[in-house]
């Protein structure tokens, strides 16, 4: 794999393959990305003709790789900032503040001490390692949160911490490097002020400029994503030129400022950046993991493993405990927070930059004889923490009652009389449901049936603040076909296109009167199962029934009993897995499964 084109194509293909396999196997994508990265590194192993270097090093030289990594990280941090809303922290803002200040100090001190005791590095290198390992980062936190999907409050705290702590850790590492390695301790305060002034000032300034350009419609729609991306990358590069490592502060502030202003919409930009983030994370993890040689990690020995264990079992729990002391978080939330702090790309990038700087300019200092271990130790921490948290986060969240194993709950957009019996039938099977309707009478009836409900529009800003823990699909079942279509479009990025459903239009007509397939959800139940027809059936006495299918009473027997007018709505498997009937999917209920259907009353049954 000596050809750069072949190598880069393989990295891209393996990255997307890892993401897809992780989705299919319901595993954290980071685990597979690391595995594929090590596989690439093994395939591109040492070549005698390269004087100890790997083929990966030959294709992506240090001078080329680190700027690419830095720019990719800047885009990821910018996208992360765009997802941060101040309203998410209305009841937990103090916890975040303590996590990124007091918690960061505890992590810095204890991680540095652990590196000194277990790995045997000198105190300067240990202090620098402690500063680098403060960061967690959206490159690992975001995929894990998407995999676990914990309750909204603790999820928001973890997401905010993962993004805000990155520039803090990078800045602290710069200060430590200048003070303890370069020997410019008298300039630390000035360096810090310079980074903050440049980072915050430039971030807010670029955000203001973008808002003004967008507000005046000086940027055409087709250039929105490109302009935002160029602005973020340009601001990052300019900040770093003025003050070293101020770029991460700039892009984070830029993203947060744009996300919380009320003048222009940025949702379409966020969607583009999310797609770009998946691509960048996939490629970065594989490329950086491919550069690591197992011999470097093995040389750390048991001391390296003890260091990783100390970070997971001692350092993070103590930092979380101190930061959440007497806070509004429950003990279960604190416990989950204490066992989720994986390190990612930012830690790898920062450690690589400082190791290169030390080896290039300060390698003759005896006090820094262990500096070459910074990168290998950081990657050991990345592998160890990602593996541990990747495997343990989801089971722990479910054990603590902060997440569910299978996000197959249903969000009902609409609470008409025929909808509520269906919602109740699903809710009785311990599957989460939420009924949302602007008609208070429908909401009141849902509450009388014991169903979680909310009087709101399903496409309102209010829904962005609603905890959708356990919810994994949308049923848009209002009388308004256009609203159903809008809801399907709104929730497709959240649940996936395969999990957004809506009722068929009142008249299915090919051509200009039908909404395009890519702009709507999957049609529920059947092509003629419109809202008016279902409502009429219920008004005439039809009922939603659950019936167990057995070998003695097959689905064919069920259809014979209730007739051809039966509308199959869904099937519950033995493991409580719910499959919904659609116009293009023919369900075949088997013995042991439960049928949910709208049936007409038989003779002698009450309406």
Stretches found by the model and what they are:
Residues 1-405:
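Transmembrane helical cores of multi-pass secondary ion antiporters/exchangers
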